Curated annotation (Swiss-Prot):
Its EC number is 1.5.1.5, 3.5.4.9. Homodimer. Pathway: One-carbon metabolism; tetrahydrofolate interconversion. It comes from the Bacteria. It comes from Shewanella baltica (strain OS155 / ATCC BAA-1091). GO terms for biological process: L-histidine biosynthetic process; methionine biosynthetic process; purine nucleotide biosynthetic process; tetrahydrofolate interconversion. This is Bifunctional protein FolD. GO terms for molecular function: methenyltetrahydrofolate cyclohydrolase activity; methylenetetrahydrofolate dehydrogenase (NADP+) activity. The gene is folD.
């Protein structure tokens, strides 16, 4: 068996095209164009790349994109004050603060300062709580994008044994909630998990988000399983690889996401979807 590739790049492009059409329709109807504020603190190269991609995607679909680049030395109070002003700005539907933040700024305090109806990253405790209560509104972007990828396979998720490897607030935990909502029997694995191999080998669906190249051997993948690889790791030779040993895993899986071109583009597409949702549901 050779896995079918889940083409995140193509699916994300399709989403952006639909969003662009909706923005055009809003303009023609005399409605306001959705606005996204992107805040970057410091000059971390990886963060700059991510932020650049998000700004470019905004422009492609016709959103208003406002950029706020702050110095690494920016105080927590300065950042919170900026968020307060964006919360009150009627032209802004979504506020994104690029993580991680410098050590002197508390991530959770910043996330909680963003108004829940403008939390297009889906990180605010209110929005995570809505997902946990099975009434999601603004959903965490990477898990939301992954669910779109899984749906594209046409596989019925109800009753699947799913394993999520990684328990971060950004991916692992909300991913577990998304899979529960989709009817999966879900196991979340983390650094204290025993018998990881045993759990992976019986999984119908595996989502891996640990940030370690080739962390999951391909031979662990159950024949016919769906593999979603969230990891994006740069090797010394410059090659980008995921958290799963791709070549062997692709021989066992029925569907697999490539790295790059799998989950990454979907995270940004979901961010754009959330921004339009916020405009339509909360701010029109």
């Amino acid at each position: 068996m050779t896995a079918q590739i889940i083409d995140g790049k193509a699916i994300a492009q399709s989403i952006r095209t639909k969003l662009s059409e909706k923005v055009t329709a809003r303009k023609e109807a005399g409605q306001r164009i959705p606005g996204l504020a992107v805040v970057l603190v410091g000059a971390d190269p990886a963060s700059q790349v991510y932020v650049g991609s998000k700004r470019k995607a905004c422009e492609e679909v016709g959103f208003i994109s406002r950029s706020y680049d702050l110095e690494t030395s920016c105080s927590e109070d300065e950042l919170l004050s900026l968020i307060d002003s964006l919360n009150d700005d009627p032209t802004i539907d979504g506020i994104l603060v690029q993580l991680p933040l410098p050590a002197h700024i508390e991530d959770s305090k910043v996330i909680e300062r963003i108004r829940p109806d403008k939390d297009v990253d889906g990180f605010h405790p209110y929005n995570v709580g809505r997902l946990a209560q099975r009434i999601p509104v603004l959903r965490s972007c990477t898990p939301m994008g992954i669910m779109t990828l899984i749906k594209s396979t046409g596989v019925d998720t109800y009753g699947l044994d799913a394993v999520v490897v990684g328990a971060s607030n950004i991916v692992g935990r909300p991913m577990t909630l998304e899979l529960l909502l989709a009817g999966c029997t879900t196991t979340t694995c983390h650094r204290f998990t025993k018998n990881l191999e045993q759990k992976i080998r019986i999984a119908d669906l595996v989502v891996v988000a640990v940030g370690k190249p080739g962390f999951i051997p391909g031979e662990w993948i159950k024949p016919g399983a769906i593999v979603i690889d969230v990891g994006i790791n740069r090797l010394d030779n410059g090659t980008l690889v995921g958290d799963v040993q791709y070549d062997v895993a692709a021989q066992n899986a029925s569907f697999i996401t490539p790295v790059p071109g799998g989950v990454g583009p979907m995270t940004i597409a979901s961010l754009l979807e959330n921004t339009l949702y916020a405009a339509e549901q909360y701010h029109d």
